[in-house]
Regions:
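Beta-rich carbohydrate-recognition and catalytic domains
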Residues: 1-40, 44-149
Length: 149
């Protein structure tokens, strides 16, 4: 399959911004796994630490997981898993004392950042999701739209 060809050593780096538009690269590797491409991570701050989720390109349903107290130095933890087929490509956010992970066409929630329960989702690929102050959710994603006639 296409993921069999994923080779290399892509690593997680970081950048900071004061305005969300202009970013400055922060020197240093935040997280790496030897002989694994780590791409498209999702990070979230929850219960006093940072949680980092990275798609495992070779194993659907499994994601690499690391945590950090300072958001700069991540330590690998046990991989996270969901019960159905899905890729840990997406967005993590916190609401109602849980982390919600909105993955590519799936969603999962966790009370502790380690144990996950999957939920039905109708979102498209790689969504960005935020929980709003009025207790509603805003999701931005894309879908191919056939030409309009």
């Amino acid at each position: 399959g296409p993921h069999d060809k994923v080779l290399g050593d892509a690593q997680i780096h970081s950048a900071i911004s004061n305005d969300g538009i202009n970013f400055t690269y922060e020197p240093g590797i935040r997280f790496a796994i030897s002989d694994r491409d780590l791409r498209d991570p999702a990070a979230v701050y929850f219960k006093g630490k940072w949680h980092l989720y990275i798609p495992n390109q070779r194993n659907d349903g499994t994601g690499y997981y690391a945590s950090s107290l300072d958001g700069l130095n991540f330590v690998r933890q046990n991989n996270v898993k969901i019960s159905n087929k899905g890729n840990w490509l997406g967005n993590a956010t916190v609401a109602k004392s849980k982390i919600s992970f909105f993955g590519t066409v799936w969603r999962a929630t966790s009370p502790n950042g380690i144990d996950w329960k999957t939920n039905r989702s109708t979102l498209g690929p790689d969504p960005a999701v935020v929980h709003l102050r009025n207790d509603s959710w805003l999701a931005v994603t894309f879908r191919k739209i056939e030409s309009i006639k």
